[in-house]
Amino acid sequence: MTSRQQNLWKTKATALDCYRWHLLRERHSLLGSIVRFFRDAVADCCFGFLAKQRLAHQIVTTPCDFLLLQSAPRIIALRRKKALIAALQELGYRLTETALPEHREILAKRLLSPPPGKTPLRYYGYAAHAAWIVARYQPRILLNDRNGSFYSPFLRLSLHQHRSTLVHLAHATTVESSRRLGMNDYDYYFLFGPSSLAALQKRKLRFGSSMAVLTGSHMIDQSYDLPPPDLTIRTVLILGVGPDREKETGFQRTYALLKEWAARTPHYQVLVKRHPRSAVPFWQEAADSLNNVSVLPKELTLAQALERACCVVNIMSNAVIEAGLAGRPVLYCNLSNDRDIFAQEAFFGPALRTLEEFQSRIKEIEADFPAEIEKARRFAFFHLAHGSQGLNKTCQALEYLLSGKALPNDIESVALSETI
């Protein structure tokens, strides 16, 4: 390795310090940023120091074509990428799924290998674990899941030593304001569609460069090509929010409004599709007291849930995009102060905040049902490239990259440069 290549790790570490400083300054005062920067640096240096003492004595290799690196072990249990895993395995590829452990586990199990390049102490632990992952699995393509991970830059550097590729798979649209979405240090960044690309391009702070690829969603397949809904079934599907949001006052008020509407409208059946991480205690209690409210089983897929509904109520769930793709008219109901990150108001009107507004929107949908179906589909294609072909297009793009070919002409790709 040349001295220039050796210095890549040091250069990357310096750039990461700069990026993390800018992230802090976006939210905190100068003094607050200084305190937090040095607090984080001390924690990282401790991890780096201990990592140097806990390098693996030997590494048993299990080479694969694709390594799917999830953000945490608990994410594997949610099986969000089961369709992608099955599709790639059916094509005959060797795919291994693993997750980023906590620092304590990395140190205890010696999941560390010396980084190929000179790395400052602060980032030694990150670089050493990234080097261990690449040495252990020897993937031809690493599929990364975790937004904002400080492992990503060092995974990319280590992979390049083996002429391998880092692909980041967006697991939702990238239209939200999360600071983690400033991380852009990947070879390829597979995005849902045009709205995601536009949102990333507008960001003032991006670390690293990538090739953004509009593959569509790898979680969407032809199961969302549903027949037009039947208005006469009078069934509304509520898309639940995550457990963290369920604790917030604005979302609790939204749930209460929807429950009150259900109580006053017994001729409509109300189905609740829970967030994968939520036990939906509010709706479980509502289902016990209201005959027209049901919480759907966890194992029921989103496509199966949508098939049972004539329209969908969304608050702040990414699943509204699949609802639109399935041609289900949308009622955007939200009593929180959160920004409408999905641009629902542009398609479905202002957020519904009262019973009167909600009932008026129901009547609007009933009055011109075919037009509302088309409006929902236009909304979906605003966010999704390739519609229900997202899984197929993702697999196709990965096959092309694996074979060293240029991406197909019908899959748009755009260079996404760094800003610092």
Regions found by a protein language model. Give the residues of each.
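Donor nucleotide-activated moiety binding/catalytic core segment of transferases
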Residues: H129, R277-A326
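Short, conserved active-site loop motifs that form the nucleotide-linked donor/cofactor pocket
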Residues: A212, N292-S294, G349
